[in-house]
Amino acid sequence: IIQGDRNKSEDIDKIDFDAYGCIVDMCLFFEAQYDLFVDRMNESTNYIFVSSGAARGDYMEHYGDYGKDKKRIEERLKESKLNYKIVRPSYIVGKGNHRPRLGHYMNKIIHREHIEIAGDGKNVVNVVFVEDVVNQLVRLATTQARTYEMIEVVGDNIEVIDLIYKVFKYVLDDAYQGNVMLVQDDEKAILPKNDFTFETNWDYTKLEEGLKDYAKWYYNEGAKKYGYII
């Protein structure tokens, strides 16, 4: 794991880029960060840029500078001589994910707390399980050829309200008593109110299968990892 402040040239200078046959870049957000390392990279190094579904043209307007910056980096890579590959995940969910979207819903439902949603909650979003993202990263990392591949790593499309209802099914019966209210709060909602859908023909983890597996993990270790109380 390469660690340091990628915004500082002196930290970038400490990296022996020639020592790496493959680099998976998960924290490149700004074009200025790209400029700091691109000339230091070996052109034959298998470089995988983790972009975002927000970089797709029909969704960029909903994600402000984040989507635009990711898109610009994609364009810079295409102009470069690097051996690049690009991954665009949708909303990542699942075991160990650093943003516990499903865990957030599980915790709220278990404690019978209200859940904030954006808009009426009927917008359709796409969720992909972290295992699927990892599998695609491994595949690309072991493909040294210059494929210049760009892949949208996605899963099932579902209305936000339906996603919450499906999570509800996997909360154990010994949860707290009471009702769970859905409250419109665009700022606190963990999923925005715009549609965010994708289509794919690759073999991904289906939502029901992934939720069932996630719930077991959540009760065994996930809640503790995220600091939630069951």
Per-range role (PLM):
Residues 139-193, 212, 224-230:
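Mid/C-terminal beta-alpha module of Rossmann-like enzyme folds, strongest
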Residues 106-116, 123-158, 172:
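Alpha-helical substrate-binding/gating segment
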